Design a protein with these regions (language model features):
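Zn2+-dependent metallopeptidase catalytic domains
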Residues: 1-196
Length: 196
């Protein structure tokens, strides 16, 4: 497997805001196609689902990362605008009864073959994840679960932004000097050390 690194120069808030809706639509279509199919085995279900969703999760991971390290109003806006859709999509896939049933069927096909231990574990964890995501819930319980999950994601983002804001605002007055988070984190005398 070849490692693919992101094109950081191209990745701007404007690019992410344009690309995320396109990826969400493409991934939704791909997941619907997988749900409509019959599993031909582990590779067909697991790898196809992973291949379909990976571009979206990779971009979203970079958005979250850049939102925390660059933390501009533009990155925050992208994160706040798209987080509800990403949470809803994640819950929709996690609560897909069809994907859950397909995973159970493929797991059953694997049997007790010792060579398939890793594949069995991947499927077992996928099934467990769906159960923790509320695949068995219906009606008001499912609505409540989804509302709590969305609110939890929103609060997590607000908390992270508050920590970043508080860190940026930090200052310490000591010995007639004010230190901030942007100052070098070593004493002035260290600047003159030949082997620092």
């Amino acid at each position: 497997m070849m490692m693919k690194f992101p094109d950081w120069k191209r990745l701007t808030p404007k690019f992410a805001a344009k690309e995320l809706p396109r990826l969400l639509d493409a991934v939704e279509t791909a997941v619907a196609a997988i749900e409509a199919s019959e599993p031909k085995g582990f590779e067909y279900l697991v790898w196809r689902l992973d291949d379909a969703t990976r571009p979206l999760w990779d971009l979203w991971g970079m958005v979250r990362h850049l939102s925390s390290v660059m933390n501009s109003a533009a990155w925050r806006r992208v994160e706040e605008d798209f987080q509800p859709r990403l949470v809803a999509f994640s819950l929709r896939v996690g609560q897909s009864r069809r994907l859950y049933d397909l995973a159970k069927r493929v797991l059953k096909k694997l049997g007790k073959d010792p060579k398939a231990a890793t594949r069995r574990r991947i499927l077992e964890k996928s099934i467990e994840g769906a159960e923790h995501c509320g695949v068995g819930l219906e009606g008001r319980k499912k609505e409540r679960f989804n509302a709590v999950a969305a609110r939890l994601a929103e609060l997590g983002t607000k908390f992270a932004n508050s920590v970043i804001d508080a860190t940026k605002a930090f200052s310490l007055k000591k010995g007639g000097r004010t230190y901030t988070i942007d100052d070098a984190n070593y004493p002035e005398t260290m600047r003159e050390c030949p082997d620092r």
